């Protein structure tokens, strides 16, 4: 909140003029960061995960990427996560895109028979968003976790979160 655009330019090692050429305000900078994170997830799904047959494993990797990417700039990512919850916010569209990405993967998992089809996809997406918000706001030491610790803890929470909506065995 108290970080200025000058601070951002200095940390990014670019001139203030260069920063302002791309981002006219802190809000536009936040939007750019959120859009870049979503683009990275889209690339992950299109490239690295394109041959992964299990949609639940794709969901796991997407959640890992969202959380691991937030660690480096945790305060900023927490602000983005908070702001994109409000329809009035310019960042709200990024939330809708995140929901769409998760919803697509949930629907794939339901079609594969690994997630229960009798549970609305939106309810499962809500569970996953709850997990994401838990990592951002309820894990105070998130920034101190090693990558391995974070993945281990997130995987455990992911499994617990989806336990009630997983099928006993895929159809």
Tell what function each PLM region has.
Residues 1-2, 13, 21-46, 60, ...:
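An amphipathic alpha-helix adjacent to DNA-recognition modules
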Residues 15, 25-26, 54, 120:
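Short coil/turn motifs that cap or connect alpha-helices
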């Amino acid at each position: 909140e108290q970080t200025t655009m000058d601070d951002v330019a200095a940390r990014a090692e670019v001139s203030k003029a260069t920063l302002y050429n791309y981002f006219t305000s802190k809000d536009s900078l936040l939007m750019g960061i959120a859009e870049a994170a979503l683009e990275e997830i889209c690339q992950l799904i299109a490239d690295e995960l394109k041959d992964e047959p299990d949609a639940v494993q794709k969901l796991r990797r997407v959640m890992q990427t969202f959380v691991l990417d937030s660690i480096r700039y945790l305060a900023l990512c927490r602000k983005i996560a908070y702001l994109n919850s409000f329809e009035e916010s310019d960042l709200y569209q990024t939330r809708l895109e995140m929901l769409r990405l998760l919803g697509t993967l949930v629907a794939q998992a339901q079609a594969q028979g690994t997630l229960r089809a009798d549970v609305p996809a939106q309810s499962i997406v809500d569970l996953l968003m709850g997990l994401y918000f838990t990592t951002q706001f309820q894990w105070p030491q998130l920034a101190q976790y090693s990558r391995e610790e974070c993945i281990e803890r997130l995987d455990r929470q992911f499994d617990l979160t989806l336990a009630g909506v997983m099928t006993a065995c895929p159809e």
